[in-house]
Amino acid sequence: MECDKCGRDAVMQAAYSGSHLCETHFCRSVEKRVRRRIRADTLLGPKATPENPETWVIGLSGGKDSVVLTHILDETFGQDRRIEMLALTIHEGIEGYRDESVDACIELAAELEMRHELVSYEEEFGVRMDDVVEENPENMAPCAYCGVFRRDLLEGYADKYDADKLLTGHNLDDEAQTALMNIFQGDVKQIAKHFDASIGDFEERAEQDDFIPRAKPLRDIPEKEVALYAQLMELPAHITECPHASEAYRGEIQELLWKLEENHPGTRHSIMSGYEELAELAADRYGGDSDSDDDSNVGGDSDGEGDSDGENSGDSDDENSDADLSECERCGSTTSGDICRKCQLLESIQAT
C-alpha cells in the first residue's frame, strides 16, 4: 500500500476518507487538522499581544491525547509571544498507575521547556482514589467521583493562574460519544451547554463570566490516529487503562460507534457535523440557561487512561449552570446550590 502523496509505504489507511499516507504525510495531516480546528474555533483571541498575552492551561495527564495535544500546541505556538502555556497534571492517587503517567508528563514538559504544575487529590482534598473506590459511600462508578474532583482542580488552578483558556485532549471518538449520549438522553439544554462550554467558535459562544472557557483542538482526530501519531513521533505517552475505569453507558455508546464506523466509515464525522449545527441552534435557544454540566467527558484519553479531567464524568451536578450561581458555603467555588458537589462527596467520604 503506497502513500497517496509520495508513493512511499503507507502507515495508515483512513476508510472514512479513502486516503493512504506514509509516516511523514500522516503526521502532517494530523497537525494540519488540529491547526485548522484552532483557527476555526478562533482559539487565539484577536486582542492577544506580546505585551498582553493569553494564558492557556493544558490538562496534561500523560495519556496519548493530552501528550499529543501538548506537543502540537508547542510546535505551533511555542515561540509565539502572544501566548503563555502551562501544563497542569493531576495525581489522583492510583497506585501502580498514575506515577508512570506523571513521569511522562514531567519528561514531556522538560523536553518542551514548558511550565509544569503538579497537584494531587491527597494534597488538595485529603483523599486518594484507591481509598475512595474501596469505600464508595455514594455507590457510584469511580469515574463519577474522579470527574468531580478533577474538574474542580482544573478549573480552580486555571483560575489561580489567570487562564484565558483551558485546553483538554478530547478526540473525535470522545466527542461523538458525548454527542450521542446527549441526544439519546434527550437533553437539549445539555447540548446547548456543550456548545457554549467547549465546542463552539469562541466568537459565537455565550458569555460565561464564572468559568474558564474550554477548547478541544483534537476533536477532529480519531482516537486511533492520535495513538498512531504518538507512537510515530515517539512521544512519552503512558498508554495504559486506568484500573478503576468503568463507565457502563459510555462503554455501550463506544461499542455502538465502533460498529457503525466499521460498517459505515465516516459516521463519527457525520455525527459531529450535524451535532455541532444542532448544538449551535440549541445554544441560541437555551444559552446561559442550562441546568447541567458541560458534556460528560473531560480531558480525552477515552481508553481509560484517567485523563477525564471532569468533563465526561457522567456526573451531572449543575455546577456549570449559569442560572442562580452562588459561592459554595464550604470552599467558595461557584455552584448552583449552597454546597458544591465536590464538598458533598468529600463529606460523604470522610463520614465513612
Outline where the language-model segments fall.
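Short, solvent-exposed coil/turn elements at secondary-structure transition points
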Residues: 9, 91-93, 122-124, 197, ...
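C-terminal, charge/polar-rich interaction regions
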Residues: 277, 283-288, 294, 317-352
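ATP-dependent adenylation/nucleotidyltransferase module used to activate substrates
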Residues: 2-192, 232, 296, 302-308, ...
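Catalytic subdomain that performs nucleotidyl-dependent activation
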Residues: 149, 173-262, 270, 300-319
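Histidine kinase transmitter module recognition
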Residues: 79, 259-263, 331
